[in-house]
């Protein structure tokens, strides 16, 4: 028994040593960035080096190629230890690459890599993607900061949920187009989500600014905690949406008409006027309903003009139509009429007298 116990202890000790040696002898790639430069794609790997004073040095290695597999091979030649992708948290695509070259081939390579998780965050950058990695954000490394930034804004702010898996589902699902958050570098220590980029056949065809993300999220996500300013004459109110849901209805086939019902329960956080009453709250609710209806309908018309369908009207109508013809839908989509009806309820307020 003592001999068996000694073997178990020795085996456990050896396993612990082996794992430590493996971790110590590799470079863990936590972020990737891709740009279109000089007719080739430049790939950049972000490697965190943890220093003795508990700070993180963000090291980057870059290589240019036309094949995604060549990036890793060429970057390996620059790295002192083997480079592994199993810890990849975020991938950034430069603006020019996303518009001119497209990103499908790159995304496909990530999807085929069994070491990369499906929950990998993707984003488009304003300007070069590599320059975003050149900053210093937070104390845990740039990749962790950027992935947390995206996750936080999806969970409790205005960015609709998306990742590697959702992007590929939307792309492969006929009648729905993918979208990604857009990241802007402000300075060496700060970045922000500046909007959303929308795709058609793997290329960015449109971008909306951050102040329109609230309305888009209402169209595609069943939960939103975004904040919004509502102007009532000379006064203003700060609204926080704590819960929302939407439902699509096909109300007519000839002509094609889809109605979107959006329900929002909100909290009134702040009011610029002297006194807030129930009557004024009703006016705020009505104003917000009007804003949602107008802005959401503007977005759907915008998407139609760009021939992108991030709301998924094509997929929805297909589910309601026997023998649906997607070739015909390509023509019919531009003539689709969308009516948005909003129902807003302010459930509580800390500023009512």
Each language-model region and where it sits:
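Membrane-proximal alpha-helical signals and transmembrane carboxylates
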Residues: 2-353
């Amino acid at each position: 028994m003592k001999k068996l116990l000694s073997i178990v202890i020795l085996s456990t000790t050896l396993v612990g040593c082996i794992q430590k040696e493996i971790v110590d002898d590799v470079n863990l790639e936590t972020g990737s960035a891709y740009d279109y430069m000089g007719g080739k794609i430049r790939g950049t790997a972000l490697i965190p080096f943890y220093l003795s004073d508990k700070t993180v040095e963000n090291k980057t290695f870059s290589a240019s190629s036309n094949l995604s597999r060549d990036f890793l091979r060429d970057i390996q030649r620059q790295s002192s230890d083997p480079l592994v992708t199993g810890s990849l948290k975020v991938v950034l695509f430069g603006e020019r690459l996303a518009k001119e070259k497209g990103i499908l081939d790159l995304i496909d390579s990530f999807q085929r890599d069994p070491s990369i998780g499906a929950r990998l965050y993707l984003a488009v950058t304003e300007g070069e993607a590599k320059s975003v990695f050149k900053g210093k954000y937070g104390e845990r490394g740039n990749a962790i900061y950027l992935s947390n930034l995206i996750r936080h804004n999806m969970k409790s702010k205005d960015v609709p949920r998306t990742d590697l898996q959702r992007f590929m589902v939307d792309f492969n699902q006929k009648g729905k187009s993918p979208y990604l958050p857009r990241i802007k570098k402000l300075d060496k220590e700060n970045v922000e989500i500046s909007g959303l980029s929308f795709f058609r056949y793997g290329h960015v065809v449109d971008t909306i600014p951050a102040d329109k993300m609230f309305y888009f999220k209402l169209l595609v996500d069943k939960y939103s905690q975004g904040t919004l300013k509502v102007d009532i004459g000379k006064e203003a109110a700060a609204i926080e949406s704590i819960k929302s849901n939407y439902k699509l209805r096909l109300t007519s086939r000839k002509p094609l008409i889809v109605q979107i019902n959006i329900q929002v329960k909100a909290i009134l956080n702040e009011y610029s006027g002297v006194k807030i009453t129930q009557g004024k709250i009703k006016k705020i609710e009505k104003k917000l309903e009007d804003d949602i209806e107008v802005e959401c309908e503007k977005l759907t018309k915008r998407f139609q003009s760009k021939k992108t369908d991030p709301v998924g009207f094509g997929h929805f109508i297909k589910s309601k139509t026997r023998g649906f013809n997607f070739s015909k839908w390509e023509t019919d989509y531009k003539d689709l009429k969308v009516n948005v009806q909003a129902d807003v309820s302010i459930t509580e307020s800390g500023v009512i007298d």
